[in-house]
């Protein structure tokens, strides 16, 4: 049964023109089959409240879409009210406080572009089109996270609509339990964010990138080298390691990229060169000291991970202290084929810091993700099985998974510390007792009984 709504509120029912294109507004072209009961596209806070009331009146669950970048397609839930924030946009910077404010639909690239003229920076996502809603709520594995910390640590306040339609502001001193949850609860956050308030930091004056590529047979030497230099690697350098098929020579290779954040009179060489003295021999390509910018990196990333592809991803936090070289050897050497890749982003030393009191609570020295990237829908099952075969092989060495990469329907794992899980159940029960929001990573039956 359809429901009478204000005419200004864009609402698409299953038989409405444009329903399917709105439903499939996702980065991943492997769109889940679930059909929302209705898709609502609010333009202001009042309309978000109207959408919540619609869900209450019809006794439906609610899903929120910010940028649509979730590779697992969490925003699509059968028979739910999907609130798509694509037309709800706010982006502003206050130079007197150095605080930015943004709606969940604003992207990493848009926030970065806003701050660049002011010489300010937030460790935004590695993909420019990632919406800030999912990014901040899941913790925010942003640029140079290993040194600059988790993006959610930069939040100083959040405006939101509760599950019963009330407007609230939360911070460390106001509705503190919701503010705690907003920093790491991910898709289990029991409210709808309308605005993030974000502390900024001085931006780098310039950036340089150095890239080194070896045949994949050199993976042991390359991985050992990265592990060795991490404790002394300059804090303004982000290292990334990727194992993939390199176009051109069309061979399986292991690639190391260093993104260097520089002051006006600094050079990449003075920050990076000390770490290159023990670099393994045998590179097939080297690109040193290439001038770049965050904007340019986003353009490059669009080529590596384009919107017109199908994606399957799973990731792990490895237990600290394992023989990382031996455990990951087969992944680095055998997983790459076609456009698929192994992605390793070391988190030391931020992984050793005591985290603030927030829901984000699971981290380790080493984060690694497997990406299958392809076009043919007939490969969906094969690609998914292949990823899980590699993941199952390393399961004894796994601490848990980054919430943004969770695939609970495929693999059960840990996304938060045990004590945070207990606390998160309590916060969800307090603010969403009817369980309208969330149902992805926590047990929905237990949430309702907490």
UniProtKB/Swiss-Prot annotation:
Location of the FAD-binding PCMH-type domain: 32-203
UniProt keywords, alphabetically: FAD, Flavoprotein, Oxidoreductase
Protein name per its UniProtKB record: FAD-linked oxidoreductase penO
Pathway listed: Secondary metabolite biosynthesis
InterPro entries according to UniProt: FAD-bd_PCMH, FAD-bd_PCMH-like_sf, FAD-bd_PCMH_sub1, FAD-bd_PCMH_sub2, FAD-linked_Oxidoreductase, Oxid_FAD_bind_N
Primary role: FAD-linked oxidoreductase; part of the gene cluster that mediates the biosynthesis of the indole diterpenes penitrems. The geranylgeranyl diphosphate (GGPP) synthase penG catalyzes the first step in penitrem biosynthesis via conversion of farnesyl pyrophosphate and isopentyl pyrophosphate into geranylgeranyl pyrophosphate (GGPP). Condensation of indole-3-glycerol phosphate with GGPP by the prenyl transferase penC then forms 3-geranylgeranylindole (3-GGI).
Gene Ontology MF, one: FAD binding
PROSITE patterns: FAD_PCMH
Catalytic EC class: oxidoreductase
Family: Belongs to the oxygen-dependent FAD-linked oxidoreductase family.
One Pfam family it belongs to: FAD_binding_4
Gene that produces this protein: penO
Cofactor: FAD
Domain of life: Eukaryota
EC number in record: 1.1.1.-
């Amino acid at each position: 049964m359809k429901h009478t709504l204000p005419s200004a509120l864009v609402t698409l029912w299953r038989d409405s023109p444009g329903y399917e294109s709105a439903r499939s507004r996702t980065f991943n072209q492997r769109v889940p089959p679930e059909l929302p009961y209705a898709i609502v596209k609010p333009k202001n806070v009042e309309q978000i409240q109207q959408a919540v009331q619609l869900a209450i009146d019809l006794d439906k669950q609610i899903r929120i879409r910010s940028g649509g970048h979730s590779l697992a397609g969490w925003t699509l839930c059968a028979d739910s009210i999907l609130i798509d924030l694509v037309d709800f946009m706010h982006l502003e910077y206050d130079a007197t406080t150095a605080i930015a404010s943004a709606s969940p639909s604003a992207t990493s690239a848009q926030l970065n572009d806003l701050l660049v003229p002011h010489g300010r920076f937030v460790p935004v996502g590695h993909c420019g089109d990632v919406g800030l809603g999912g990014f901040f709520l899941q913790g925010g594995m942003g640029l140079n996270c290993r040194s600059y910390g988790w993006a959610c640590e930069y939040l100083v306040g959040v405006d939101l609509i509760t599950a019963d339609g009330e407007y609230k502001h939360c911070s460390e001193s106001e509705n503190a339990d919701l503010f705690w949850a907003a920093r790491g609860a991910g898709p289990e956050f029991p409210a709808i964010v309308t605005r993030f308030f974000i502390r900024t930091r001085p931006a780098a004056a310039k950036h340089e990138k150095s890239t080194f590529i070896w045949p994949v047979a050199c993976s042991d030497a390359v991985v050992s080298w990265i592990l060795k230099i991490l404790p002394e690697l300059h804090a303004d350098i982000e290292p990334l390691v990727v194992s993939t098929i390199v176009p051109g020579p069309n061979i399986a290779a292991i690639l190391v990229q260093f993104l260097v954040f520089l002051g006006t009179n600094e050079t990449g060489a003075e920050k990076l060169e000390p770490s290159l003295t023990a670099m393994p021999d045998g590179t097939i390509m080297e690109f040193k000291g290439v001038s770049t910018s965050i904007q340019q990196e986003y353009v490059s990333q669009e080529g590596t991970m384009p919107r017109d592809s199908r994606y399957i991803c799973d990731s792990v936090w490895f237990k600290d202290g394992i023989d990382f070289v031996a455990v990951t050897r087969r992944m680095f050497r055998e997983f790459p084929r076609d456009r698929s890749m192994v992605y390793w982003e070391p988190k030391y030393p931020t992984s050793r810091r005591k985290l603030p009191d927030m829901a984000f609570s699971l981290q380790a020295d080493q984060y690694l993700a497997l990406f299958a990237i392809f076009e043919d829908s007939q490969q969906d099952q094969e690609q998914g099985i292949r990823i899980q075969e590699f993941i199952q092989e390393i399961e004894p060495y796994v601490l848990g998974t980054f919430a943004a990469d969770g695939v609970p329907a495929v693999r059960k794992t840990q996304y938060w510390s045990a004590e945070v899980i207990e606390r998160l159940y309590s916060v969800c029960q307090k603010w969403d007792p009817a369980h309208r929001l969330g149902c992805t990573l926590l047990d929905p039956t237990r949430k309702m009984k907490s």
